[in-house]
């Protein structure tokens, strides 16, 4: 059972979250829950107040979608991201090889300086999903257009080469340009707003989706995708945070939710060390509603997403929702009731438990994480009697500057 925490705990946690910018700059906060939902109009248009602060959920001022704590840049809102529209229309040249990197960076710099304050210290999430930076990852009808367009580009640029050589030019040209676009964009963001946490939404990918595999579903990431993630060393080295998606697939049976989420996060932890002396923070994206039905996540769903993220030692989660959750007064009240009755109490419980475990087991110098990732019943939860417990199922992931089994040893 998850205890419904009282007013004292709510007020105490709220006081901890007053200076949210400072909180995001300091990794020594065990687990953060951020709000990336366009809910501002619930208050401004319909008069429905969503008490996010009191529930321990970090939001932008006025609950705006873009702000000082989290900003997400979509494909058509940032720089000159090249892609093909649903009708085959090429935007910004369509493929990375066709766009001017200098022009892209100039426009991106203007947008960063305009949209993010000079003291920005939140999450800066780039949502570029149309193509994958490695050639082999662009399969399926939606992404094969990038291979075809790249081959056409190579035929035009290198007409004297034979088809095999042109195909090689298409592949290398695509991958080099894609890398330059993504890598330089991250470097630019970190140069202009160095206190922000910059990364790409959905990366690293895992490829463990549900394909009606029934009893042989393991949740493991696809071996080919693990290999590609290893090849993307440059992307992890250029990032300052990782934002994998743990959206629950519509047809995935609930019995497999935990293993689905666990393997996605474990792959993120694996690449988080690449090119860095200390692991990158991992903040997983959680969708508030089920895509197929629009239903809010149940308490069990929250345990298998937010709860598993906390128990594995993630830095936090980002809650995402679309405009439908604030489309009317009725929908806003539905969101309000869900926040107050289900989501909020669970967030308070997990963040309080993560802090307690950090202090009791890791001397406040690390995050608690499962000793055995397969230990499916152990969660960072406070019990109804408020017994914080010994957290025997958890080990420590030490913060920068600390080491040892309980993070008690200073590390230069």
Curated annotation (Swiss-Prot):
Keyword Endoplasmic reticulum in annotation: yes
Residues listed as glycosylation sites in the UniProt record: 69, 216
Xref: Gene3D superfamilies: Aldolase class I
Protein's name in the database: Hyaluronidase-3
Location(s), subcellular: Secreted; Cell membrane; Cytoplasmic vesicle, Secretory vesicle, Acrosome; Endoplasmic reticulum
PROSITE patterns tied to this protein: EGF_1, EGF_2
Gene source species: Rattus norvegicus
Protein EC: 3.2.1.35
């Amino acid at each position: 059972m998850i205890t419904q925490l009282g007013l004292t705990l709510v007020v105490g946690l709220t006081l901890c979250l007053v200076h949210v910018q400072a909180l995001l700059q300091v990794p020594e906060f065990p687990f953060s829950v951020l709000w990336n939902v366009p809910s501002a109009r619930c208050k401004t248009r319909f008069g429905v107040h969503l008490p996010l602060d009191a529930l321990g959920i970090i939001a932008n001022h006025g609950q705006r979608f873009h702000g000082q704590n989290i900003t997400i840049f979509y494909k058509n809102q940032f720089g000159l991201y090249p892609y093909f529209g649903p009708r085959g229309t090429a935007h910004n040249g369509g493929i990375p090889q066709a766009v001017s990197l200098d022009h892209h960076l100039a426009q991106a710099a203007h947008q960063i300086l305009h949209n993010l304050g000079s003291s920005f210290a939140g999450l800066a999430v780039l949502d570029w999903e149309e193509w994958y930076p490695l050639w082999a990852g662009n399969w399926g009808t939606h992404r094969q257009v990038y291979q075809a367009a790249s081959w056409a580009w190579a035929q035009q640029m290198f007409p004297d080469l034979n088809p095999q050589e042109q195909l090689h030019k298409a592949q290398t040209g695509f991958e080099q340009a894609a890398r330059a676009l993504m890598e330089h964009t991250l470097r630019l963001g970190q140069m202009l707003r160095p206190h922000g946490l910059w990364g790409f939404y959905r990366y690293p990918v895992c490829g463990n989706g549900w394909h009606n595999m029934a009893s042989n579903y393991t949740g493991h990431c696809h071996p080919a995708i693990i290999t590609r993630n290893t090849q993307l060393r440059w992307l992890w080295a250029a990032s300052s945070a990782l934002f994998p998606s743990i959206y629950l697939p519509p047809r995935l049976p609930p019995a497999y939710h935990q293993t689905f989420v666990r393997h996605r996060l474990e792959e993120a932890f694996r690449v988080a060390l690449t090119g860095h002396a200390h692991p990158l923070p991992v903040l997983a994206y959680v969708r508030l509603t089920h895509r197929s039905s629009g239903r809010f996540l149940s308490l069990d769903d929250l345990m298998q997403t937010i709860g598993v993220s906390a128990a594995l030692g993630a830095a936090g989660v980002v809650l995402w929702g679309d405009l439908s959750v604030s489309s009317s007064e009725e929908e806003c009240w539905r969101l309000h009731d869900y926040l107050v009755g289900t989501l909020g109490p669970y967030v308070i419980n997990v963040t309080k438990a993560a802090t307690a475990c950090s202090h009791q087991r890791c001397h406040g110098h690390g995050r608690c994480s499962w000793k055995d990732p397969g230990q499916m019943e152990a969660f960072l939860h406070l019990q109804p009697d408020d017994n914080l417990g010994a957290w025997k199922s958890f080990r420590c992931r030490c913060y920068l500057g600390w080491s040892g089994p309980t993070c008690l040893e200073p590390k230069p």
